[in-house]
Amino acid sequence: MRKINFFDTTLRDGEQSPGVNLNAQEKLIIAKQLERLGVNIIEAGFPASSRGDFLGVQEIARTIKNCSVAGLARCVKGDIDAAWEALKDGVEPRLHVFIATSDIHLKHKLKKTREEVVEQAVAMVKYAKERFPVVQWSAEDACRTDLDFLAEIVEKVIDAGASVINLPDTVGYLAPKEYGNIFKYMKEHVPNIDRVNLSAHCHDDLGMAVANSLAAIENGADQIETAVNGIGERAGNAALEEIAVALHIRKDFYQVESTIQLNEIKRTSDVVSKYSGMIVPRNKAVVGNNAFAHESGIHQDGFLKEKTTYEIISPELVGVTTDVLVLGKHSGRHAFKDRMKTLGFKLTEEEINKFFETFKNLTEKKKEITDDDLISIILEEKVADRKIGYEFESLQVHYGTEQMPTATVSLKNQETQEVIQEAATGAGSVEAVYNTLERCMEERIHLLDYRIQSNGKGRDALAEVYVTVSIEGKETAGRGVAQDVLEASAKAYVNAVNRHLIFKSNLIEIEKHHAIS
């Protein structure tokens, strides 16, 4: 059976989603989860774009052992050199080099002729091949490129040493039949096409990214470029989880297989959602909360009699546990450690001790601790280790229907260890909290977005708040989890500011590194 490779671009194209700004530690956590998921290639970033991206890609390449790590580059020597330096210590360094090929891009962006683009593409693929064992070449805006010219340039970059040819629908324009026909055309008109793997990269501007990717597979594509939860620039990329499950459930039709560990899908989706701040819609295929819910009476009756009447995907297949085991205040360290292992977390003894303490504190407020609660604890604590910015200490809010809400907040400056306490009012309780926090902080902060959802079920479910703020003209997302909505709101705000300060700290370190070197 033919094998389909999954090239995941969550950390590169996915991070280009508006409002998403992952720090290096968060990217590494996501990369490790993608490795557990079983993707074949992780596109970790664009090393030449910034020193921060370079170091992030380098760390991921040095850490990941069970799949290839790729970096993006333009057809420019400087980009290729930067990518090699970032990736050379990886298991299988892979370059993803691209140049636009459509007439509209050649005329308005590159200001080059077709002949000049062919010459540049061939020269840079040859240059890259001197370093990289695997070179993937992309024809940016392939779907609006003249097919005869596309076939010509593809043939020449294959002769230059490309191992993978990517034909992206950069603007999400084509219908599935049209996109599939491009792969068919390449198969029929490029003499050396059998020497390479063909790759599909689809955007969801017209809602057809997954359908187009599957059409590419039907017409000979060997690799699919995806992002977890379908995140990405504009309307997003093809959703990894939807394609992986479709290929599995309809193996009879597609006759292909992959290395994706389907039972890791839900946790991967949760990890990406929590760190990116992009909430998964309830009706999202495969990973949405409603994906396995049945409300219609007729559907419920049939489902209870025989699941397969209305359920083609079992929750267990994608890692949605139906295990009702819960932990509580009487659960010991061993039970906690065992549950962490069951959930797939590999923790050191030091981490277990720290997380167990957080867990015990939560049991004083919440009777039953679910898997969702545990995952939230781990994800929040894992990125709270760097002692930069502010530590949230306490919050008190006074509210009455006929009174102006007043908040009192205590924060600790983690650099000076000074405890800062302020009070302020607001039109509502959340505004009062945020006005108070701003009085505690030196930064000028503008709140752009505020979202809240429950984590788990029941009246004692944890509140999960996501905010997007602008500081010094830069957007940063923050996340906070607590049993109380106002505490979660405060933590999300502090988290966003701390992420901004960590980003600034990283830039300072990078500038110091440049000065030394």
Curated annotation (Swiss-Prot):
Pathway connected to this protein: Amino-acid biosynthesis; L-leucine biosynthesis; L-leucine from 3-methyl-2-oxobutanoate: step 1/4
Regulatory domain: annotated span: 391-517
Annotated GO CC locations: cytoplasm
Cofactor(s) it depends on: Mn(2+)
Tree of life domain: Bacteria
Residues that span the membrane, as ranges: none
Name of one Pfam family that matches: HMGL-like
Tagged with keyword Cell cycle: no
Cellular compartment(s): Cytoplasm
Molecular function GO labels: 2-isopropylmalate synthase activity; acetyl-CoA C-acetyltransferase activity; manganese ion binding
GO biological process: one example: L-leucine biosynthetic process
EC number: 2.3.3.13
Xref: InterPro entries: 2-IPM_HCS-like, 2-isopropylmalate_synth_dimer, AIPM/Hcit_synth_CS, Aldolase_TIM, LeuA/HCS_post-cat, LeuA_allosteric_dom_sf, LeuA_bact_synth, PYR_CT
Annotated catalysed reactions: 3-methyl-2-oxobutanoate + acetyl-CoA + H2O = (2S)-2-isopropylmalate + CoA + H(+)
Ranges of residues in domain Pyruvate carboxyltransferase: 4-266
Function: Catalyzes the condensation of the acetyl group of acetyl-CoA with 3-methyl-2-oxobutanoate (2-ketoisovalerate) to form 3-carboxy-3-hydroxy-4-methylpentanoate (2-isopropylmalate).
Family that this chain belongs to: Belongs to the alpha-IPM synthase/homocitrate synthase family. LeuA type 1 subfamily.
Name of the protein in its database record: 2-isopropylmalate synthase
Organism (species): Bacillus pumilus (strain SAFR-032)
